[in-house]
Amino acid sequence: MNKVFNEFVYKISQDQIEKIEEYFFENNIKNYYFYETKEGTFLVLVFEEKQEKIFLPFNLEFVENRTTTSEDWVKNLITKPFEFIEGVYVDPDHNNVDGEIVIRITPGLAFGTGLHDTTKLSAKFLKKYLRPGMDVLDLGCGSAILSILAKKLGADRVLGVDNDPLAVEAAKENVERNNVDVEIRQSDLFSNVDGKFDLIVSNIIAEILIEALKDLPKFLKKDGVVILSGIIDSKLPLFKNYNIVEHWRSNEWNALVIKI
């Protein structure tokens, strides 16, 4: 179905991109992308329905409000395969990609054009800690890129959940494109989760991670592994009382492996 979207376009400078992405991540704003032309760099916010221009705490030059279709929108996103982490490639189409693992993802409104540092950190930890046959929960799965990666790394049961219906829709489409046995559900944290898991990965904002940790032990098998990402430097002290096994950092973002 070729949906019609409402877009707000802003002209920005290159040095604003990181701060904008940081603000959007912390405020759970997923419906955006960036693009460049000879006229400069632009930020586009995308909405499914008619929307008033939203406030952004940046000095941005508003360019226009326009409508576009889902087919045209996808053309503005990732068009070429790229190496996501070592040995793992993301391919928006059926290209002949030479890699250990290839994930075919059509970016949707569940995330922006680039894959965030937090996603890459999560993926690197998944590759390090996941063993074939593990049961994996992806809490806040977004596009399901981590769920799909877990399955391709040899996981047994993989469940991806997200509270955003747009993310769930995009995740299901991506699972189908990759022809993997991954279950996707809509869920507010653990509200629609059953069973126990050897590994739980969650790439969401720090405050929600702290909230999730209250119930997480009920869903973790003995000696299970927990991967937490989406933690900006200023929020890292929130996790000081947890048993941190490993800590990786990229730019201002942190990912932790903890044992409970």
UniProtKB/Swiss-Prot annotation:
Record flagged with keyword Glycoprotein: no
Compartments, as annotated in UniProt: Cytoplasm
Enzyme Commission (EC) number: 2.1.1.-
Record's signal peptide: none
One Gene Ontology molecular-function label: protein-lysine N-methyltransferase activity
Keywords: Cytoplasm, Methyltransferase, S-adenosyl-L-methionine, Transferase
Binding site for S-adenosyl-L-methionine: T119, G140, D162, N203
Any one GO CC term of the record: cytoplasm
Catalysed reaction, written as an equation: L-lysyl-[protein] + 3 S-adenosyl-L-methionine = N(6),N(6),N(6)-trimethyl-L-lysyl-[protein] + 3 S-adenosyl-L-homocysteine + 3 H(+)
Main location: cytoplasm
UniProt superkingdom: Bacteria
Pfam families membership: PrmA
GO biological process, one term: methylation
Function comment: Methylates ribosomal protein L11.
Family membership noted in the UniProt record: Belongs to the methyltransferase superfamily. PrmA family.
Name of protein: Ribosomal protein L11 methyltransferase
